[in-house]
Amino acid sequence: MSQDFINTDNHTSNLSSNNLYTNINAGNSIMSEELAVKDNSNSTVASDNTERTPCDAENGSIYTTGRSVVSDNAGNQDKGKNFPNGESSSASGKSENSHADDENDGSTENNSKLGQPSFSYDSEIFQLCQHYLTTKNHQGLALVARQKGLPPFLRFKIWPILLKHHPFVVNPFIEPDNEVNNENDTNTEEDLKSDIKRDLLKYIHRLNYTNLIDLNNASPEEQEVFKILESSILKFVKKWGKIMKYDHALTWIALGLAEWFPPIPNTSWVLVGRDFPSSKTSCIKNLFHDYSNYINNVPNLNEYLEDLVNDKEIINMSFRDVYERLVLVLLHAPEEKIKNKSKDLLGPKKINRKILPINGGTIEERVSFFIYCFRKLLPELSQYFQEEQILNKFGSHDDEWLIWWLKWCGSKVWSRLDRGRIWDLIFGWRLQNFKKSNSYYVEKLNLSDNLINKLGPDNFWSVSKDNDDSTIENYKKSSSFKDLINELNINESSNSNSPTSNSPSNSSINEDLLPPSPLSSSSFSSSNIAPADEFNIPFSKLDPHVELLFVTLALLKSKENTLMELDQHEIRQFLSRLPTKSINISNKYKHFKPQESDMNNNIISNDSRNNHKIDFMDNIINESGELWRKWLWSEMIDDN
């Protein structure tokens, strides 16, 4: 048997139909052209009674843009004062006096001590992002999203643009559910509404498990938010019901979107997410509140954000339209003709590890590929999981966490902070149009060599094109992975000026797998340096769901020591509610705290003077690229 194929008999035979949708009786999904081009549709108008708002547990008040609205029990709060972006005088004081325990891992129990989330951003890239947003340059926004992530407080404007132009929305395909045509299914629209409402209430209970909230007694804004969510989910299921039936994960996707995109038009109200204390008496908050330190450090950013909230020119999509496109991206699967070719030649229970990284696969194929990579890249943790009978089989209540991670892209189980950064990566995924020259993209994106250097190469780069033939000849590789590497590097092959090394390394993997950084003086001679307009733009190489798979492996690697101290039940519980990767540094480690932001490197931080945090998500995404290259290298060696 060829080593290119993974036998999935041991992994997918026990997959529960409750968790995974197979591709039986699959058909082509059809979407009207308006989905890819339509900007606005029917939108719900916010309640007129804006003065009756829920209480913010931190400050005693909750804010609309540029104005504070004092709650009934505000008591000692300043009344009638105007604060930029709704920030009260007590907000910064609370943030600066917050400290975490020495062993704080960012879990929900410790989030009350986290203060504002960790966030730092290069000012030049931020200005570039603003320019792309103003000019509606979706290619530029996608580039920033996948390379550096988006400023969190701009996602509400940028995500709709990225989703509108995403390749999976322009050419959608959702893997059909083989149970969707079940004749015994007698669920009515009222039953569907009841299911959606029940799942929405689970979110509220998850936030306020010590203080249950009755939506009938909630503020008008909260009621309206959940009403919009319910109608958006219902509309999606009714439209796409012939392809897939309702799953409660669809509600959690909508809730995840509402944590960054305000459901009520022209407001900044978003759901709080589980990163906040459970004592909160409100389910909504001002999107900009968490990033006030950063916003106040950028001149005129307050006014800019206020204008964006009320803007209808850049993008004007309703929540339901953004939600529909979001689901199409997260649940995209390869078209049937691609899968049929593989099945006709290889058999239904074999997946080609050469093809899947580029073309993607069904959720069953991705789960099998994940387990294969997991055992190869993290052998000790994989062995411990086997001893604890984790990932040995799939049932309705066993290892459902992996389905939430891989199929539903972290909905429900990941922190909103971590999920937001990973969704940036997925939404920014773009392949290069080979009909366009590289200089066209440089000019179109208005990039200097300095900005290209700051953005860096694609995170999932592989061996350089000039190294392909000599490397594979040196190690006598099979045509399988030579073809894979050639396909991964077709971008470089279209550009004769790509600056790469001319010979493989004889000593180390890192030297052999050189990143295609255009400004690395050590990787090429001065005679090979291309003009600035010929530098390579970092386009995506792997399928976005395969990128997510390696991000998942990086997350597991980051928690390997913790996981190996837990038993079976604790592991599943931990992975079903993964702590945020943004943690706080306590007084014990203050001597490791960096000094004030270096103005020379143009980095602006959201940290306050006495409250420094670390956001590990960029490290996680970088590590996922390293794991990809480690896997690719090991496959090349094994094929020898």
Curated annotation (Swiss-Prot):
Keyword Electron transport applies: no
InterPro entries: Rab-GAP_TBC_sf
Compositionally biased intervals (Low complexity): 85-95
Gene3D superfamilies referenced in this protein's UniProt entry, alphabetically: Ypt/Rab-GAP domain of gyp1p, domain 3
Biased composition (Polar residues): 39-48, 61-76, 107-116
Domain of life: Eukaryota
Localization, UniProt: Cytoplasm
One GO cellular component, as annotated: cytoplasm
Chief location bin: cytoplasm
Organism taxonomic ancestry: Eukaryota, Fungi, Dikarya, Ascomycota, Saccharomycotina
Region (Disordered): 39-116, 492-520
Family classification: Belongs to the OCA5 family.
The name this protein goes by in its record: Oxidant-induced cell-cycle arrest protein 5
Record flagged with keyword Glycoprotein: no
UniProt keywords, alphabetically: Cytoplasm
Annotated ranges, domain Rab-GAP TBC: 149-430
